[in-house]
Regions:
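A short, structured active-site edge motif that brings together acidic residues
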Residues: 76-88
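N-terminal binding-site loop/beta-alpha segment at the start of enzyme catalytic domains
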Residues: 1-78
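Short, well-ordered coil/turn segments that N-cap beta-strands
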Residues: 11-16, 47-49, 73-77, 121-125, ...
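Beta/alpha (TIM)-barrel catalytic core signal, keyed to glycine-rich beta->alpha loops juxtaposed to Asp/Glu
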Residues: 132-317, 321, 331-334
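Conserved, mostly hydrophobic/aromatic
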Residues: 6, 18, 36, 51, ...
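Active-site groove signature of glycoside hydrolases
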Residues: 116-135
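Active-site mouth loops of central-metabolism enzymes
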Residues: 22-34, 94-106, 135
């Protein structure tokens, strides 16, 4: 395993981290409980020390499973979680629709205490605002509350996790430029590079580390869909999207197959190397759903890095819409 330091902190994160949503929700398909535990345990054995979860994943289960499976190694690991969604509202959630958000000081303090309890720990390494809109980010009292939690030793550092659906440019720029955050979590992959690409210079200038999730673009870059599209489980988020988005993604994937090096670097490994070529990205969070994912994705760190020539070709493809008839990228991650 390779490690990268989160700027202005003492945290050394594994270059490949573990996004706990795959074992805390069914958004990426169902996994047996025994397999969930095995994935987490084997991730640590393979060198992963960074685990990213959220209170909303499985209504707290994404934190509880870390305590249950990895609690005995707590001091060796970096636990990041997120807050901002009111998971305590008894109103049933409507499918995958976004919950109501709350960022007032009292709620933030309450949410932090509940996360500490579920994680079975007295401190959180990285506490992230979960998909905050600009109206939350401009509230000084929110960040004063986070600083107080930091002073009390309940959280070590705080950051933002920027979400899907809206452009997020304003939120990203404001967070990186005007708030003393340690990290910003973004979506960044071969198929979806903006607005993360736009944030990289700002992140470098302000010494903020970027964390990149879904580098495989809903598994279109893993080979899973090379021979057709499956019928997704109803709980899988991909079941609620039209096939057109997958079809478009696979047309783009066909343009970047030159990255594959037979017996040396798979497409999935190339996708991880593509993300980690950016020095501002401290850790990449692929979706681990089976044991072979651990071997392949962590193994990406031992494969040839993306060359400058390959990067230049990738940049040109991105700028020209992957040479498709429709030059505007339509693929969007969650």
């Amino acid at each position: 395993m390779k490690f990268r330091k989160l700027p202005r902190t003492d945290l050394e994160l594994s270059a490949v981290g573990f996004g706990v949503w795959t074992v805390a929700t069914n958004w990426w398909g169902k996994i047996e409980d025994s397999d969930k535990a095995a994935l987490l345990e084997n991730a640590v054995e393979e060198g992963i020390n960074f685990f990213d979860t959220a209170d909303t994943y499985g209504d707290g289960y994404g934190e509880e499973i870390l305590a249950k499976v990895l609690g005995h190694k707590r001091n060796e690991l970096v636990f990041a979680t997120k807050f901002g969604y009111d998971i305590y509202d008894p109103t049933p959630r409507d499918g995958h629709k976004e919950r109501a958000q709350k960022f007032d000081p009292e709620f933030v303090k309450y949410a932090c205490e509940q996360s500490l309890r579920r994680l079975g720990t007295d401190y959180i390494d990285l506490y992230q605002l979960h998909n905050p809109k600009i109206d939350a980010l401009v509230r000084d009292e929110l960040f004063e509350t986070l600083e107080q939690l930091q002073f009390e030793g309940k959280i070590r550092y705080f950051g933002v996790a920027l979400g899907p659906d809206i452009g997020w440019v304003e939120e990203g720029e404001y967070s990186l430029r005007d708030r003393e955050i340690a990290s910003a979590q973004v979506i960044y992959s071969i198929l979806e590079q903006d607005p993360a690409k736009h944030f990289m210079k700002l992140a470098e200038e302000n010494e903020v580390g970027l964390l990149s999730r879904v580098p495989h673009a809903s598994n279109t870059l893993t080979g899973e869909f090379d021979h057709g599209f499956p019928t997704f489980d109803p709980d899988d988020h991909r079941a609620h999207r039209k096939n057109e988005w997958l079809e478009e993604a696979m047309r783009k994937v066909s343009r970047v197959r030159f990255l594959v090096q037979e017996d040396t670097r798979t497409m999935a490994q190339s996708a991880i190397q593509f993300v980690l070529k950016q020095p501002t990205i401290i850790s990449v969070l692929p979706n681990f759903t089976k044991m072979t994912d651990l071997t392949e994705y962590i193994g990406a760190l031992e494969t040839p890095e993306i060359t400058d020539e390959e990067q230049a070709k990738m940049d040109e493809l991105w700028e020209h819409g992957f040479d498709l008839a429709d030059p505007e990228p339509q693929f969007r991650e969650i």
